[in-house]
Amino acid sequence: MQRLLPLLLLLLAPALPAAAQARDDVFPYALKTERLPNGLTVVRVPFRSPGLVAYYSVVRVGSRNEVEPGKTGFAHFFEHMMFKGTKKHPEGERDRIVASYGFDDNAFTTDDFTVYHAYGPTAGLDALIELEADRFRNLEYAEPSFRTEALAVLGEYHKNESRPELKMEERLLGTAFQKHTYRHTTLGFYEDIKAMPEAYAYSRSFFERWYTPDNTIIFIVGDFDDAAVMKAIQEHYGPWARKAAQLNMPTEPPQKEKRTAHIDWASSTLPRHVLAWHTPAGSLTTPSAAIQSVLAAYLVGPTSPLYKELVLEKQLAEFIGSDFYPHRDPHLLNLIATLKAEDNRAAVDAALTRAVRELASGKVDAARVKAIQSNIRYGLLMNLEAPDDVGVQLALYAGIFGTPDALSRHLQNVSRVQPEQLVAFARSYLVDTNLTVLTLTPANGGKQ
């Protein structure tokens, strides 16, 4: 799967009307939350969408959980295997039933969690609940099917490595991280993917350890009968009885000096330049995630002086931005530039560095900070036009922060960020000893 999370988390749109801005509760829809005795959290969100419902299952397992040497890529692999079937619904039957109702049905994997989602008619909701509960409880696949899908995952890697982004991510993470599992991508290390067909027994244990009710949150958004939904949920998910494994997460040691990494890209593309600093984990009880969300937009967002200078006026860069989003453990805040030519690299690097140092010196535009806060907070809410929009945003933030109301609480934290907090954060974390610089130079030198 392509990593769409940064785009989904950083949706920007015009501000909401003043009446909506005045709400104390920044999320406009009620969450009805119940935790079953087995630990499964079920969240229902009534939404005016006659005849339509979105169904999101968030499993808090991602590439972060892959701590065993030689066993990376399995969180993503299970995104594939979860569509294989069960004894009750053999391979292909679930797809046929889902398609017969007209559901859109898919999944995606991230560093920290995996999401399964379906969107379609309420008339098929009872059938969908039974199908989803069955595969989460009773997934079955034979070793030949496992081997076939493992080869498909290897093919997915080969497809992705033809683009610069995968190799850039691999090199950046492998340079910035020495111990933590964030040092590999969601796809996993290439050697581990090649060896995956021989790991059938391990795959079964991975499923048993992480696909558990106490590690899963379900969001149901749209037009449905709440009592009937909860009755079906309790009937089909109630017998699910596994418990999530305990994880001994390796701690990343502090970085003590600037690191660099370079890629010579064999084919024609534009040069790339990335600055990345280690920053704190996402949390709803501290301001770090909210500060970084605002800070990324402040430094390189489309309203930033840097964007105006480098992209619009001097045209040294095709694009500047950041794909920052919060992580469960300390990760990276990055600034990314796609250069129009290799000759522009020094000037772009100098401009990015200057902007960071100016902020750390105390120079901050309070009015622009406030505008960015409004755009992040209300712009995202303006995009909640359909049950599927609501479901995906709730799922993404719940996957990161581990609580159903994470989206609302994060947006509240964003609204509380003060300009001086950006300055203090830059002084503490955006320093050279904490920095990794990644450069990519294409074979043509970036000349198009």
Regions found by a protein language model. Give the residues of each.
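Short, polar/flexible loop-turn hinges at active-site or ligand-entry regions and domain interfaces
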Residues: 84-89, 136-144, 364-365
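Bacterial N-terminal signal peptides
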Residues: 5-15
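N-terminal post-signal-peptidase region of extra-cytosolic proteins
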Residues: 27-29, 57-62, 204
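Proteolytic maturation boundary segments
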Residues: 17-44, 225-265, 272, 276-278, ...
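M16 family metallopeptidases and their MPP-like homologs
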Residues: 45, 49-69, 73-77, 91-136, ...
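His/Glu-based metal-binding/catalytic segments typifying zinc-dependent metallopeptidases
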Residues: 58, 158, 245-305, 397
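N-terminal secretory signal peptides that target proteins for export/translocation
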Residues: 1-2
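Non-catalytic, conformational "gating/processing" segments within enzyme and secreted inhibitor domains
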Residues: 150, 165, 202-236, 434-435
